[in-house]
């Protein structure tokens, strides 16, 4: 399985012949190396409804026929307002098997809304995601602050990789993210959600250096990938 990082919180997972795109904030993101019109994933996974995470989902899903996996409230909005048909609606605590493996939604402490035609629309609870693919557990925290039940996420799902936001201001910063890594007891931590905007500028290498002994960290440059 190959996992690549594409700026902000956008990652791509390739397992066998299946491609999964997560939080595809591409257009308007100077830190992203992808082009929305070239993306042909089989699945799109959304952590929540903020524009810098939903991003180009509608265009990509309509062009590719991808199934969108997200919380049920956001799923209803995308179906009614944007005409998406291939949607797998879930909620926090639920897990579901797909052709590539299992998806389980976890809680996240953040918001989830958009503005459409001058209206503020709430889009349900934000989520994290635990992927179980090829007998590996990957935790994508989404946008979140630190919370103590991260310990439980790690206990229930022994983690091989965790993608954690470090940008501060809108999510946890590097100090709290290092505590999150300790709570999760993951084998590898990859920072995300930083340096896209001035308010979330951070040094990811300094964050990786701050991790507890026994927890590995890796900074993925834009477009860089790892194999697990």
Curated annotation (Swiss-Prot):
Q: Which domain of life is it from?
A: Bacteria
Q: Which UniProt keywords apply?
A: Hydrolase
Query: Which InterPro entries would you find in this protein's record?
Result: Metallo-B-lactamas (IPR001279), RibonucZ/Hydroxyglut_hydro (IPR036866), UPF0173 (IPR022877), UPF0173_UPF0282_UlaG_hydrolase (IPR050114)
**Which residue stretches, if any, does this entry annotate as coiled coil?**
none
Q: What GO terms are given for molecular function?
A: hydrolase activity
The keyword Metal-binding belongs to this UniProt entry's keyword annotation: no
| Keyword Cytoplasm attributed | no
Pfam families, alphabetically?
Answer: Lactamase_B_2 (PF12706)
Protein family according to the UniProt entry? Belongs to the UPF0173 family.
Q: Mind telling me which HAMAP family this protein's record contains?
A: UPF0173 (MF_00457)
> Which protein, by its recorded name, is this?
UPF0173 metal-dependent hydrolase lwe1590
